[in-house]
Amino acid sequence: MESGNVVNAQPELSGIIDGSKSYVYEQLWKLCAGPLCDIPKLGEKVYYFPQGHIELVETSTREELNELQPICDLPSKLQCRVIAIHLKVENNSDETYAEITLMPDTTQVVIPTQNENQFRPLVNSFTKVLTASDTSAHGGFFVPKKHAIECLPSLDMSQPLPAQELLAIDLHGNQWRFNHNYRGTPQRHLLTTGWNAFTTSKKLVAGDVIVFVRGETGELRVGIRRARHQQGNIPSSIVSIDCMRHGVVASAKHAFDNQCMFTVVYKPRSSKFIVSYDKFLDAVNNKFNVGSRFTMRLEGDDFSERRCFGTIIGVSDFSPHWKCSEWRSLEVQWDEFTSFPGPKKVSPWDIEHLMPAINVPRSFLLKNKRLREVNEIGSSSSHLLPPILTQGQENEQLSVASPMNISLRYRDATEDAMNPSKLLMSYPVQPMPKLNYNNQMVTEMEENITTKTGTNFRLFGVTLDTPPVIKDPIEEIGSEISKLTEGKKFGLSQTLRSPTEIQNKQFSSSRTCTKVQMQGVTIGRAVDLSVLNGYDQLILELEKLFDIKGQLQTRNQWEIAFTDSDEDKMLVGDDPWPEFCNMVKKIFIQKRR
């Protein structure tokens, strides 16, 4: 932290990047920081939350945050201006962080006009999750064909063995040389000589992410993003325990008492304790209440952005020592258990409203929460909540799940059966049929038109019956809910689906079969990857399909390759099984050369 000196003159805004850093460096830093990185703008009015700053060093102190009492009388939030931002990287771990200089928002700070239309050079980049083959001592780094063409310098394909030397610079300014060639069977882009030295120096393992960025001038940059399990809360070389105890709060207090600047360390994966002034006001004006449905952006294990859904079940102070603070003031219940569970308490600016709040008793929400905690392991349909996106769906398209496609899942069959309307009141469900007519519903409506067989009247020999009675579609929905609830009593688990959902499911199911072609065999086969658990089962299944038992396991005579959507041909087994299933389009069994 900077020492607190009184600032009498107007401070100079030094900018987000100093003179020694290029625009390509900035883009590389952002890619290494991740999809959820939210750095404030230079000169922006923000709120600084000391609680969030303290949370950054929670692991270092090994104490619960609600036990950390303020050592001085400091408000829960402080209004500031962003004076300077410097994007940096930790020396030992290559973790990105930003040094942000703040100043109490006063008239002394003059913000220069920012040119929003400033020319930005074109930058090409790609990221890839490293496989075991990429990090092996005797292997190289496989670059997908599309990324090699767009991001790397062009190879001279007229040569028998196209090759070139690449010079890449990391965030520390260190230079790395790689031999880029196009070879192998099948041929593909590889980084060989120099790659092993890079992975060893950076201590890379399978699951880490490699980032390449290339500017218009040919400047090539390389960076890494470590897997979540390798990261700590804060680099020890930046902030110590004593600094957390006395420096974080004391320096902020000193800065506001003396109207001087102070600098904080801001990590992309930490909670947002520097929040845009406008974003904070929007979040507060939303008035999140108990029962409100929300969505929140979270980072998945594959470094992609996920949209998760939940319900607010409480509003209270996160710490008794910081009264009336908006920091993590919302207690939430997540819809589904995931491998990276979301926080139990969130801040209003971290989430987005799905729909207006519903007046739901807190006791009912807590009861359902306890029921889910008991049944969430081993039960896939134990609650009435919208599903999150699966990893495969995210790889194909990052999108927000519409609240109109929320599936019905039931918590307590006995209670719900006694009061089906409770389901419709407690959580958002499908709109009523009058808003969602389709062919299937219209057919059902027509079938529900019945004629009473009471007294018949004749007029000129024609029988006149009583008018037809049309059943209320709302009653029909309630009846369907009762039927499904009764089914669950006998161990059945069902889900209401619209015809569109059923059609989409049938379409996705038909895509699970992958075509397989074997050299020398005219007629191909098809294999269903969704029923297999790994490469070993795939090899056994292929041997059965072509009646070549034992010949594929030894790999002395045959080898297995596949093509992706870009028609790139690669060997089977170099990628994690889920990633392989997502990108494979066709499998080939060919003679080994």
Swiss-Prot record:
The organism's place on the tree of life at top rank: Eukaryota
Keyword Kinase: no
Xref: InterPro entries: ARF_dom (IPR010525), ARF_plant (IPR044835), AUX/IAA_dom (IPR033389), B3_DNA-bd (IPR003340), DNA-bd_pseudobarrel_sf (IPR015300), PB1-like (IPR053793)
Keywords: Auxin signaling pathway, DNA-binding, Nucleus, Transcription, Transcription regulation
Any Pfam family matching the protein: AUX_IAA
Keyword Nucleus appears in the UniProt entry: yes
Entry GO CC: nucleus
Residue spans binding DNA: 126-228
SUPFAM superfamilies for the chain: CAD & PB1 domains, DNA-binding pseudobarrel domain
Single Gene Ontology BP annotation: auxin-activated signaling pathway
GO molecular function, one term: DNA-binding transcription factor activity
Subcellular location as annotated: Nucleus
Domain annotation PB1: ranges: 511-592
Function: Auxin response factors (ARFs) are transcriptional factors that bind specifically to the DNA sequence 5'-TGTCTC-3' found in the auxin-responsive promoter elements (AuxREs). Could act as transcriptional activator or repressor. Formation of heterodimers with Aux/IAA proteins may alter their ability to modulate early auxin response genes expression.
Family: Belongs to the ARF family.
Oligomeric and partner information: Homodimers and heterodimers.
Domain text: Interactions between auxin response factors (ARFs) and Aux/IAA proteins occur through their C-terminal dimerization domains III and IV.
Name listed for the protein in its UniProt record: Auxin response factor 12
